[in-house]
Design a protein with these regions (language model features):
Chain C
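Conserved structural motif at the start of ABC-family nucleotide-binding domains
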Residues: 3-5, 18
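Helix-to-loop junction immediately C-terminal to a conserved catalytic motif
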Residues: 49
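The feature captures the beta-strand-to-loop junction immediately N-terminal to the Walker
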Residues: 34-36
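Conserved ABC ATPase "signature" region
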Residues: 85, 89, 96-114
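ABC transporter nucleotide-binding domain
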Residues: 159-175, 179-237
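Catalytic Walker B motif of ABC-type/P-loop ATPase nucleotide-binding domains
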Residues: 143-147
Length: 277, 342, 268
């Protein structure tokens, strides 16, 4: 049974369609990434999956149950703001979570947090509080873990370590739903759901998303006028290490305007651009 | 500077909520308070007891509105009625000259009565002021003031409690934990309840000591009233908190609930003097009833039985606030569930 | 004459936000500051434009600087046009030249069609572009942009970078901060910040060359200097000793920054 099943989920705020007919699933032990820019609808989707926001139409099921009726103990959530009490210490925050969920407080030493036990969360650096929030969200061994942009603003080393932790959690069988706006993190997920303007523009693992999409690479030295012409014809021009790459137009068209070009496999970012056009 | 002014103008015009407050509020407030602010006494509910009950009423000034004329009732009965607040003036007839008993806890009525009796004395009529013989203003104001302070501070402080959670993002976490909406509500009120209870005791004690306010009755009804009153005041604060988007709004709303309570709860302007259209607002305010209970106990020595109505109303208000707040929480903490139920 | 900071230290109470940081921003070039949240990027920006006092070092700053804060700097309840007009008024720019400049900026940023839209109705990308336009309107010599691309979709990010390059082409000195290491290649020089300290600085090629030791790739982790990267692990060998079962790879900037962070950690 799919742990998280979202079907035709939509949310409208007045005229704005924050989420538009979204469908996806997360299985046990799977890591699914919601990938998209700010405003694409990732956070709104997660809040609907958690039952914090009622959808305009469509539905979200957790372990086969409508989200409103799911036992809260099956869910673990780390929001963008981390959701910790800044005036309470690390130990107090974790104890509150443990008591709310009816489990024993976690072993701080095992989590590497003992030196911060009696420090107030508001005084600690972001990297540490992120780890605390992560512990708080899984100390009751939830079936589903939902993380809203956990790597936002984190440096490369911090991000790598965070993904290690996420993989370890998934290995215990927890279904993980993560959102991010870093394209390169698509590699870390078993599957990604690419979102743009509330809609799903693609889904699958990285190779599936890219599959078959081609970009045209053009060497540097093309005038702005030619680039404008390409844009007029509907292509998107992206910068690369050694020139320009055009997404969305076939090689023949590009060569005609620019005079040269080679077809190359698209990068993930380029695939995203092509699919969300 | 001109650029700055222009920008501010544009922003204010687009901010409809603030604009409404700036323009509409002063008008509304003026209307309401204009009709409320009055020290004039039009009627004094009166009881006449004793053998003269049949013919004395017509001899009394028009201001004394005779509601009960009971030939079999005694002076003791009359005092009971005054203590319970059923009437504010009693004429005791008997063998000797009639005695007028005045309720000193209703300052303006008592003063109006004294004035009338002094201006047109009925031969042989003597009057006694019960419950506040000196017609001392502090005695009448302090109990109500204490209540006002508590309601103000209590509502203000709790009004920010939920907003803070929303601003720091912890409200979402509460929503995904196994808490029931009423757990959250009671949990939020509890610490403030404890502290505010101690507060009430301190404020009333200081009031009685410094301002010579008597404590003529038993403390029990006062405690019951204070607890019920606190529950309502703090509950209103939490309710405000759950409908405010940020702390500034919460404080605004809390202040807006404090202002009417000063003017319309009867602690300054007697309820009976207010235009009926405005008086009904006073009947919805918890402070009105706490004032009645506090004055009743402290000045008139009233007991639980006498104060049943205001106490019951306080408890009823508490139940209403509780239900509203919990419903509001439920729609915030479990919106998906609320939807499924409909 | 280049602008920038020389060994600048900024403290807030007990906390040190910047410790002896130096950066040069040349006219006509783009300097990029890369770092995680809390690394000191915003403090660096604010210090450079004069919003924060310093506890040590020197600042080289022209009279006219333009600044775009992390929050885009756009007023939500004013229209695009009103936002720009307000900035023009605030700087006391003469009406006609200001109007021409506004029109040019609207065209370059592609915001012409949205000129009557309220700030809060703009998409993320458009709001950022407006913010940059507002910072550039007064024709400053030094332009400081704090995280203009964070959270934007790839296309908006590219459009913003085109706008920035164009502005550099006009001779302005530009400093941009970002959390995306892959954006560092868009600049002429890069500074990597971590906890208020400089991890690496120079041109991208110089920074990569200066990485000590060697980098390897493997299917499994190997020791404390390993980190995940997608489906494989990166392993850093400080003494350039080969790692069994791993192949050597050439590092990109993200790798170099990670290595520097690891080295800094080991020292602490």
């Amino acid at each position: 049974m799919r742990v998280v099943a979202v079907t035709a989920l939509s949310k409208r705020f007045g005229e704005v369609r924050a989420v538009d007919d979204l469908t996806f699933e997360v299985g046990q032990g799977e890591i699914v990434g919601l990938l998209g820019a700010n405003g694409a609808g990732k956070t709104t989707t997660m809040r609907m999956v958690l039952g914090l926001l009622a959808p305009t139409s469509g539905r979200a099921l957790i372990e086969g149950e409508p989200v409103g009726r799911v036992d809260r103990r099956r869910l673990g959530y780390v929001p963008q703001g981390l959701g910790l009490y800044r005036e309470l210490t690390v130990a107090e925050n974790l104890r509150f979570s443990a008591e709310a969920f009816g489990t024993a407080p976690p072993d701080l030493a095992a989590e590497g947090l003992s030196e911060y036990a009696n420090r107030k969360v508001g005084e600690l650096p972001r990297g540490v509080t992120r780890r605390v929030a992560f512990v708080a969200a899984r100390l009751h061994d939830p079936g589903v873990l939902i993380l809203d942009e956990p790597t936002s603003g984190v440096g490369p080393l911090g991000r790598a370590r965070l993904w290690e932790s996420i993989h370890l959690v998934a290995e215990t069988g927890t279904a993980v739903l993560v959102s991010t706006h870093h394209m390169e993190e698509a590699e870390e997920c078993d599957r990604v759901v690419l979102m743009a303007q509330g809609r799903r523009v693609a889904t699958g693992n990285v190779s599936e998303v890219i599959s078959g999409l081609r970009t045209v690479a053009v060497v540097a030295g093309v005038t702005t006028a030619r680039l404008d012409e390409i844009r007029r014809l509907g292509g998107t021009v992206l910068l690369s290490n050694d020139g320009w790459r055009v997404v969305g137009l076939p090689l023949s068209v590009v060569s005609e305007v620019v005079g040269s070009g080679t077809e190359v496999p698209a990068t993930f970012e380029e695939a995203f651009v092509a699919l969300s056009a | 500077m001109l650029a700055m002014t222009l920008k501010e103008f544009r922003q204010v015009v687009r901010d409809h909520r603030t604009l409404a407050m700036l323009i509409v509020m002063p008008v509304v407030l003026l209307l309401v308070f204009g009709y409320a602010a009055s020290f004039d006494v039009d009627v004094i509910p009166t009881a006449v007891v004793g053998p003269g009950a049949t013919n004395v009423p017509e001899q009394l000034p028009e201001l004394f509105d005779v509601e009960t004329a009971d030939a079999d009732a005694t002076r003791a009965n009359a005092e009971e009625m005054l203590r319970a607040g059923e009437v504010n003036l009693a004429v005791v007839t008997g063998d000797g000259p009639p005695v007028v008993l005045l309720d000193g806890s209703e300052l303006f009525m008592a003063r109006a009565a004294v004035q009338i009796l002094a201006a047109a004395p009925i031969p042989g009529l003597d009057y006694v002021v019960l419950f506040n013989p000196e017609l001392d203003t502090s005695a009448v104001l302090v109990p109500g003031l204490a209540g006002l302070i508590i309601v103000f501070v209590g509502t203000l402080v709790t009004s920010m409690s939920v907003v803070r959670e929303r601003e720091t993002g912890t409200l979402e976490q509460l929503a995904v934990m196994p808490f029931r909406p009423r757990d959250v509500f009671m949990g939020k009120i509890a610490p403030y309840f404890l502290i505010a209870s101690i507060d009430i005791v301190i404020v009333l004690t200081i009031g009685t000591l410094l301002f010579d306010v008597p404590l003529n009755g038993s403390v029990l009804p006062l405690i019951v009233g204070a607890l019920a009153f606190l529950f309502v005041a703090l509950g209103v604060g939490v309710l405000i908190s759950s409908v405010s988007e940020n702390q500034a709004q919460a404080i605004q709303l809390a202040l807006m609930t404090a202002l009417p309570q000063i003017m319309l709860s009867g602690i300054i302007f007697p309820l009976s003097s207010m235009a009926p259209a405005v008086r009904w607002i006073g009947y919805l305010l918890p402070l009105t009833y706490f004032n009645q209970v506090a004055k009743g106990v402290m000045l008139r020595g009233a007991g639980l039985g006498d104060l049943l109505m205001p106490l019951a109303l306080l408890v009823a208000l508490g139940a209403v606030i509780f239900t509203l707040a919990v419903t509001r929480f439920r729609s915030q903490l479990r919106p998906a569930r609320v939807r499924a139920a409909t | 004459m280049s602008w920038g900071l020389s060994r600048v230290t900024v403290r807030f109470g007990d906390a040190t936000a910047l410790a002896g940081v130096s950066i040069d921003v040349e006219p006509g070039e783009v300097a990029i500051v890369v770092g995680a949240d809390g690394a000191g990027k915003t403090t660096l920006c604010r210090t450079l434009v004069g919003l924060e006092g310093i506890d040590g070092g020197e600042i080289r700053r022209p009279d006219r600087t333009g600044f775009q804060p992390e929050t885009s700097g756009v007023w939500n309840d004013l229209t695009v046009m009103e936002n720009l007009e307000f900035v023009a008024g605030a700087y006391g720019l003469a009406t006609d030249p200001a109007r021409r400049r506004i029109e040019t900026l609207l065209e370059v940023t592609g915001l012409g069609g949205a000129r009557d839209r309220l700030g809060r109705q703009l998409s993320g990308g458009m709001r950022q572009k407006l913010g940059v336009a507002m910072a550039v309107l007064s024709d400053p010599e030094l332009l400081v942009l704090d995280e203009p691309t964070t959270g934007l979709d790839p296309v908006s990010r590219l459009e913003l970078w085109s706008f920035i390059s164009l502005t550099a082409g006009e001779g302005k000195a530009i400093l941009v901060t970002t959390t995306y290491t892959d954006e560092a290649r868009r600049g002429n020089s890069v500074l990597a910040l971590d906890g208020g300290r400089s991890l690496a600085s120079g041109s991208v090629a110089e920074v990569i060359d200066a990485m000590p030791g060697a980098l390897f790739e493997s299917a499994r982790s190997h020791g404390p200097s390993s980190w995940r990267r997608g489906r494989t692990w990166r392993i850093w060998s400080p003494e350039a000793e080969p790692v069994p079962g791993a192949t050597e790879v050439s590092p990109d900037l993200a790798d170099v920054v990670t290595v520097a962070a690891l080295a800094a950690e080991a020292r602490r």
